[in-house]
């Protein structure tokens, strides 16, 4: 028998709270407004977000798009009940992929899915997304919040991000003049960033620690909070260095797969990256993970950034100029390696020296 009249079912009875969704929208409006930039000044709530390329100052742009997630780092945020920074990670994973192609991030959209919507939790997450957008200089022009009872366990959620940027035609990276002898610069990471967290969680499980335990690799932080250090956003320093020096030939975002998977993606087939591992200043978190989990250096290098979240390829004569431009914007820069000749079928990344873990 169907339900009808005053005893009929409602959407809320099925586990979807429209009022909670509306409350979330009101809570996040100030955060969203704070991300406005030339080209985007609309309000959220429409069927689609708008962006005016001409108002953003482009004349002959090529659009560049990227999407990504945060992975199982979210599980730590959920278990530690700390949701303020995973939105920064979400933005970082997308916009860092745009800037490596020479593109300026313009706008961002998010997808937030949960089994039971908590407006305060959702506002914390979106607040982090807005913070990441401000840091990257892109507008949060829309998104989707999906309350899906039965799809997620209580308290669980997932995030996906979508970013679009632009570069003037002819200004895209990598350039076509990468050459043997060019120097590879490494930009320091802020921590584990957003890759390898399934292994991180397994190591923490083996350690016997919980998320509220003091972090064994840093002072004055709980383990969960320390591991949730947000992914560094390299956009503004890199864009400034690209424009001021004109000397950056290629960039690579060091994410899942580490050096061996990410650096070759931006290199011509006849060149390989020779990385001097002795130059890498490995942050304590990676040393702790390696020792606690008994993880070999080779596995660390293909799972984590190990302290280098971005690399840049420049000609030898431009190392000082590019390094100075990046350091002036707060980046820590090392000379990580150089470009060498690569035989057909050979690896795109080779190592010398020893990783200090």
Curated annotation (Swiss-Prot):
GO cellular component: cytosol
Pathway: Purine metabolism; IMP biosynthesis via de novo pathway; 5-amino-1-(5-phospho-D-ribosyl)imidazole from N(2)-formyl-N(1)-(5-phospho-D-ribosyl)glycinamide: step 2/2
EC number: 6.3.3.1
Catalytic activity: 2-formamido-N(1)-(5-O-phospho-beta-D-ribosyl)acetamidine + ATP = 5-amino-1-(5-phospho-beta-D-ribosyl)imidazole + ADP + phosphate + H(+)
SUPFAM superfamilies attached to this UniProt entry: PurM C-terminal domain-like, PurM N-terminal domain-like
One example of a Gene Ontology biological process annotation: adenine biosynthetic process
Keyword tags: ATP-binding, Cytoplasm, Ligase, Nucleotide-binding, Purine biosynthesis
Highest taxon, organism lineage: Bacteria
CDD domains per UniProt: PurM
A GO molecular function held by the record: phosphoribosylamine-glycine ligase activity
Entry-linked Pfam families: AIRS (PF00586), AIRS_C (PF02769)
Cellular compartment(s): Cytoplasm
Keyword Secreted: no
Keyword DNA damage: no
Segments traversing the membrane: none
HAMAP family: AIRS (MF_00741)
Family indicated by similarity: Belongs to the AIR synthase family.
Name of the featured protein: Phosphoribosylformylglycinamidine cyclo-ligase
